[in-house]
């Protein structure tokens, strides 16, 4: 990586979350900005829940901030700050990226779902026809559910401790993806051949599994949105059973090009 040069004309991008130490975006996007010839940097912002709204207003009011990435747990809370939403963000009610427009307004969109699907396809996985159990119906989970349904999975069982949230997502999917069988579940079905953790479980070293999974058939595809230097509990479980897997790092890589295009309007 070349030496980072910052001056008064440097444009700023920030990633906002709680916690923030786990994120890989600042290093990656500083490199991508430099490769694109942009005088821009991305910085991490650790924002506590009670200060999130104020922080967003302050950041979006700064004239030299051109974009924001939003990570856990704020993807849903960030959506109302956008002047307009892209198609995916409108569908799921959450954003993971915001871009300042020339007139000072802000556009928000969600790339987690597309990033997860692209990450899986890059590894040669075929998603069509899969019977999916999905842990988590928050911003990332909603986006992944939409993209998996669009990719042609046969069924999707949504597992979330907030039943109302899971039911709301299921209802949206039944309308937008009528060919996919959608249900709200409390556990992984025995006929599931794809399991995805789209919850925050696995971010801490002390975390266990997002739910009861049990023994896995080696043909089961396992995914996790948690970006970690080491394998998360669910990915370790998959490896022990000889299952192929899509990690949070795969999802992160899968959406980096789309996010750069979003920020640069390429």
Task: Give the predicted meaning of each segment.
Residues 150-155, 240-244:
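Conserved S-adenosyl-L-methionine
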Residues 177-245:
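Rossmann-like adenosine-cofactor binding region
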Residues 118, 227-228, 243-266:
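Active-site capping/gating segments
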Residues 17, 110, 120, 125-153, ...:
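Glycine-rich adenosine-cofactor-binding loop
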Residues 6-7, 127-128, 152, 212-220:
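Short, conserved loop/helix-junction motifs that constitute active-site signature segments
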Residues 153-176:
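NAD(P)-binding Rossmann-fold cofactor-contacting core
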Residues 70-77, 140, 200-203, 228, ...:
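Short glycine-rich anion-binding loops that position phosphate/pyrophosphate groups of nucleotides
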Residues 3-123, 231:
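Phosphate/diphosphate ligand-binding glycine-rich loop within oxidoreductases
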């Amino acid at each position: 990586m070349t030496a980072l040069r910052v001056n008064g004309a440097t444009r700023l991008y920030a990633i906002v979350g709680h916690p923030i130490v786990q994120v890989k975006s600042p290093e990656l996007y500083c490199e991508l900005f430099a490769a694109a010839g942009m005088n821009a940097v991305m910085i991490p912002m650790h924002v506590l829940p009670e200060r999130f709204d104020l922080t967003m207003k302050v950041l979006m009011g700064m004239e030299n901030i051109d974009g924001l990435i939003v990570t856990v747990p704020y993807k849903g809370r960030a959506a109302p700050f956008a002047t307009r939403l892209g198609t995916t963000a409108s569908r799921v009610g959450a954003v993971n990226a915001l871009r300042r427009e020339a007139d000072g307004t802000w556009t928000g969109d969600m790339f987690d779902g597309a990033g997860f699907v692209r990450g899986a396809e890059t590894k040669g996985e075929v998603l069509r026809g899969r019977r999916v159990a999905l842990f988590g119906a928050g911003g990332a989970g909603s986006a992944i559910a939409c993209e998996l349904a669009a990719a042609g999975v046969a069924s999707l069982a949504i597992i979330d401790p907030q039943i109302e949230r899971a039911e709301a997502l299921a209802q949206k999917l039944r309308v937008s993806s009528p060919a996919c069988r959608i249900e709200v579940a409390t556990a992984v079905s025995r006929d599931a051949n794809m399991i995805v953790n789209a919850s925050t479980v696995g971010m801490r070293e002390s975390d266990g599994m997002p739910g009861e999974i049990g023994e896995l058939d080696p043909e089961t595809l396992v995914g996790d949105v948690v970006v970690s230097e080491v394998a998360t509990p669910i990915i370790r479980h998959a490896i022990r059973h000889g299952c192929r897997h899509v990690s949070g790092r795969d999802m992160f890589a899968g959406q980096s090009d789309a996010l750069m295009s979003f920020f640069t309007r390429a």
